């Protein structure tokens, strides 16, 4: 018999996370590594677990995720988004709680591009009056 699997895709900045939720005891595996090995900071680990803790499903599902692109913070945000979307497929009644917490909303803030004539996105070259 095939195992029940729920899929979700999360994005944040340049990071994309493909998340699978499988009934289990709460193990989180990211790119074939444990969450403690993958994220060095507890704040990032907590950020990934937030949707599961909010819906009280942390001990019901194992999370298997593949994430690439971006930095650690972007990847953690992408995982949070992907887990929330997968939880929604598992149980549609979780939508109000996840929506209220803002976990279903894609954070659209992106890095602003560098403009010509400037040192960065907005930083202008030093100005000398004389």
From Swiss-Prot:
<dbReference type="GO" id="GO:0006412">
    <property type="term" value="P:translation"/>
</dbReference>
<dbReference type="InterPro" id="IPR020568">
    <property type="entry name" value="Ribosomal_Su5_D2-typ_SF"/>
</dbReference>
<dbReference type="Pfam" id="PF00380">
    <property type="entry name" value="Ribosomal_S9"/>
</dbReference>
<dbReference type="GO" id="GO:0022627">
    <property type="term" value="C:cytosolic small ribosomal subunit"/>
</dbReference>
<keyword id="KW-0689">Ribosomal protein</keyword>
<protein>
    <recommendedName>
        <fullName>Small ribosomal subunit protein uS9</fullName>
    </recommendedName>
</protein>
<dbReference type="InterPro" id="IPR023035">
    <property type="entry name" value="Ribosomal_uS9_bac/plastid"/>
</dbReference>
<dbReference type="InterPro" id="IPR000754">
    <property type="entry name" value="Ribosomal_uS9"/>
</dbReference>
<feature type="compositionally biased region" description="Basic residues">
    <location>
        <begin position="111"/>
        <end position="130"/>
    </location>
</feature>
<dbReference type="GO" id="GO:0003735">
    <property type="term" value="F:structural constituent of ribosome"/>
</dbReference>
<feature type="region of interest" description="Disordered">
    <location>
        <begin position="109"/>
        <end position="130"/>
    </location>
</feature>
<dbReference type="InterPro" id="IPR014721">
    <property type="entry name" value="Ribsml_uS5_D2-typ_fold_subgr"/>
</dbReference>
<comment type="similarity">
    <text>Belongs to the universal ribosomal protein uS9 family.</text>
</comment>
<dbReference type="InterPro" id="IPR020574">
    <property type="entry name" value="Ribosomal_uS9_CS"/>
</dbReference>
<keyword id="KW-0687">Ribonucleoprotein</keyword>
<dbReference type="GO" id="GO:0003723">
    <property type="term" value="F:RNA binding"/>
</dbReference>
